[in-house]
Amino acid sequence: LLMCNLCFADICFTSASIPTNLVNIQTKNKVITYEGCISQVYFFILFGVLDNFLLAVMAYDRYVAICHPLHYTVIMNRRLCGLLVLGSWVTTALNSLLQSSMALRLSFCTDLKIPHFVCELNQLVLLACNDTFPNDMVMYFAAVLLGGGPLAGILYSYSKIVSSIRAISSSQGKYKAFSTCASHLSVVSLFYSTLLGVYLSSSFTQNSHSTARASVMYSVVTPMLNPFIYSLRNKDLMGALRRLFRRKP
């Protein structure tokens, strides 16, 4: 259930921007309507934050599997998983609706040129002509609560996981426990490192093109890599990859 929702969120996250960009490249038309831009803002926030929430839920799932293996099926039952996924969807949908609705109050002086490959809310706020203080406050609190909250949960879960793995006496047991969460840890590291890269790029450079290129990583590359990273645990896929690389030309 968790994996299906994460894969669905990743597909929708990339679909929020790639189809429009492909059409623009084909038609050589870089214009997007106001309604289309607000729609991109809504879905971009929705599935981006949903990714964050689902990664936190999956971190808790790994924590229960490693730290409380005998109670795993009792704790992580289908009802709890369903409630966690539903809560993630409802919270992110309400947040996305609030922020995109707040974007409707922004006014722009002339035809707007966004130095980005997708309509991101922070770019719209920077280019607005009217008072953006309410938008800034909403974005700030959303980043702290909906971004920092799941991250804190992930860090806490992995601190407990590391402590449990260190307490295992056999090296084989440690390897088996680590392999249980290796894929999730790789996805989390990739997700937050690309977000950090975008933040640092926008903070220390004034070049909008470099910021746009950096944002491609977390909005396109990372969601496309996530299913592949998780599928590496599939023995059939690993066997096929080994046969492919061993095949002589």
UniProtKB/Swiss-Prot annotation:
It comes from Rattus norvegicus (Rat). GO terms for biological process: signal transduction. Belongs to the G-protein coupled receptor 1 family. GO terms for molecular function: G protein-coupled receptor activity; olfactory receptor activity. This is Olfactory receptor 1571. InterPro entries: GPCR_Rhodpsn (IPR000276), GPCR_Rhodpsn_7TM (IPR017452), Olfact_rcpt (IPR000725). One of its GO terms (cellular component) is plasma membrane. Disulfide bonds join 37-119. Pfam families: 7tm_4. Tongue specific. Residues 61-82, 159-180, 233-249 are cytoplasmic. The chain crosses the membrane at residues 1-9, 41-60, 83-103, 137-158, 181-200, 211-232. Residues 10-40, 104-136, 201-210 are extracellular. Possible taste receptor. It is found in: Cell membrane. It is a multi-pass membrane protein. Keywords: Cell membrane, Disulfide bond, G-protein coupled receptor, Glycoprotein, Membrane, Olfaction, Receptor, Sensory transduction, Transducer, Transmembrane, Transmembrane helix. Glycans are attached at residue 130.
